[in-house]
């Protein structure tokens, strides 16, 4: 019976829903609240805390179709992708889970029923394995399911190491663990390979399709196994493998999804041979790259972003090997969204963003590839010997993004080789850096185990009576604290908000009859709330009655900033586009920090627009409403979920009028008007495709505006002062120039009726400078008449000077007025010195030329 991949996905979820399982959506490829994991790589990742007992949900049975990535960390399939039938960087894991509900019998029954009845697989093509000592599972398969004993294989420990077996699963060196049973499909004798547990088991005849893990024990540090009070079940079936069986093909790359992508890749590249392995690489990589970007990962040089960049560049390189010209990889996003069916809806919503990120990265790599080739050729030209060292190979790969296989190909063309061991050593160091990169902070759940649950009253109150249920000092549980002890205090109930969703934890004071504990921070520890701080006086013991009081002033500032982040998020989406999604936030009393997806710097005008919109919503004074509803109802209402957060089945939906509706478990103001004022203080990039805005609200916003105004006023005054000084210096230079020109004017003195006369036009000089020149010229000629004019900024300036021995014949005022009248002005002054102004600059030359005739009549 043929079934498409999408039909299998829907059939699986519907089957387990009919068995009382809650269908849970695939979680993000970026693990939520798990600092130990690079990418989600199994269906159970999102239920880890349920299996550990630190999280309780309103269901005990769940089923998922979980998207997974295995690349760049401990589970890394990247190097094998495209060259085997079943290795992928991206895959979907179908799973059903029981949290202390059903166990082996039902898990085995469900698996067998789905495979043989719903999918109609022939029972004689199925083979099962059990852990060597798991007689219970063997009996269920043999006696209840009717599987012949010769088709049930017991798998023991690897080389005798206790519990080191493919059929014994453990989360770590300690903690939940247990045996597992695996179901294999026999592709037939025409395919090489042996049964599980034989030397030929690595062949492709018998393929594992479903693994059922029975979490039955709690393993202690000394290796002893203690039965769990409520055993659980974790199962996983790769959708690509079961699709290959249902579609009658042997390789995963022959199923509908990959065949569609391979054909589309061949079309955009312009390549005809659909069997080429590079097309497989491209088809696989477009899935992991697209969904990593959907889940908030952007290409970068570290952590998750570095792994994404490696996958993109590997895909681009394989396209180039097939002759791809220009950018091609991003063109496969649309076909992928279509062929993924029900699992492609999120990708369709963000298709434009994914295409843009991939196109930019591909174009950048094209330039990097060219630089890398130039450096490689230079290194090979200067090589002493026949082996290119591993450090150079890694530098080309890591710094220039130059693929090692291409380095090897180029070297081989010159009959040279590369140091593969040295390269692998450097690569492993990089992989280790990638594993350790990211948000790998303190995991309090891994350090401290708390069985109790804290009831939170902080939505409605800032103080509460409580009892001390646990005390931890330096990670160890203690019965009492003494003054000066730093500790974590657990109460049965509390008004203190634990850090979550970007909102920092509350601070305050917890008092008991015999002491006072100052709380500096608050975190979630399982289902309890840990109050971090110091006992500043007295003693404090387990079971003490306490009064917990939150610092109200600090919290008030925090909630204003938190409410403002929701307005900011909505405003950014309105101004920049709906591709904007929150990638992180930090809400403190002092300010707020908001990280969001956007590929370029936000323009100044866009920031002003965002700021105006937020402040407009503040002035509208929307009531901030919080409603509790199930997750499906919240989505129907249009509520946005925040990046990296895990949500329970019942969620808090925060609404600010019709402007913003988001899921949020934080504490908020009563109305937007309480925020008062919003001011952005900075905007910048923190990673490829991720921008960060920092802002303040209320009094802090007013202070920021005043500080900006003071800074602007200071700069304005400094600029004005500098301009004034420059004007002064310019005038001094003009005066100096005019003074220098006055020396040359002596040569232009002429005589009229035996009297020395100087008439000249000196543009650019100020009137003050001209007066000085007239005085200087009078001294130089001893006896005579001087008439100077200038044009400055379109206006005419005139200065006339007459030595005292001649003022009986010619008065300076009469002379200057005669000239001024011709240039549209007038003036006056002493008989020996007079000045005037005018407006007709073009008439000045003729006006000065008339002086000679005027003086001739009077001398």
Curated annotation (Swiss-Prot):
Binding, Zn(2+): 562, 566, 664, 668
Keywords for this protein: Aminoacyl-tRNA synthetase, ATP-binding, Cytoplasm, Ligase, Metal-binding, Nucleotide-binding, Protein biosynthesis, RNA-binding, tRNA-binding, Zinc
Species: Aliivibrio fischeri (strain ATCC 700601 / ES114)
This protein's name: Alanine--tRNA ligase
Subcellular localization(s) per the UniProt record: Cytoplasm
Free-text comment on the cofactor: Binds 1 zinc ion per subunit.
Cofactors required: Zn(2+)
Similarity comment text for this entry: Belongs to the class-II aminoacyl-tRNA synthetase family.
Catalytic activity, as annotated: tRNA(Ala) + L-alanine + ATP = L-alanyl-tRNA(Ala) + AMP + diphosphate
Enzyme Commission number(s) of this protein: 6.1.1.7
UniProt-listed Pfam families: DHHA1, tRNA-synt_2c, tRNA_SAD
Written domain comment of the UniProt record: Consists of three domains; the N-terminal catalytic domain, the editing domain and the C-terminal C-Ala domain. The editing domain removes incorrectly charged amino acids, while the C-Ala domain, along with tRNA(Ala), serves as a bridge to cooperatively bring together the editing and aminoacylation centers thus stimulating deacylation of misacylated tRNAs.
InterPro entries: aa-tRNA-synth_II/BPL/LPL, Ala-tRNA-lgiase_IIc, Ala-tRNA-ligase_IIc_anticod-bd, Ala-tRNA-synth_IIc_core, Ala-tRNA-synth_IIc_N, Ala-tRNA_ligase, Ala_tRNA_ligase_euk/bac, DHHA1_dom
GO cellular component: cytosol
Gene: alaS
GO MF annotation: an example: zinc ion binding
NCBIfam families per UniProt: alaS
Stated role: Catalyzes the attachment of alanine to tRNA(Ala) in a two-step reaction: alanine is first activated by ATP to form Ala-AMP and then transferred to the acceptor end of tRNA(Ala). Also edits incorrectly charged Ser-tRNA(Ala) and Gly-tRNA(Ala) via its editing domain.
CDD domains: AlaRS_core
EC class of the enzyme, as a word: ligase
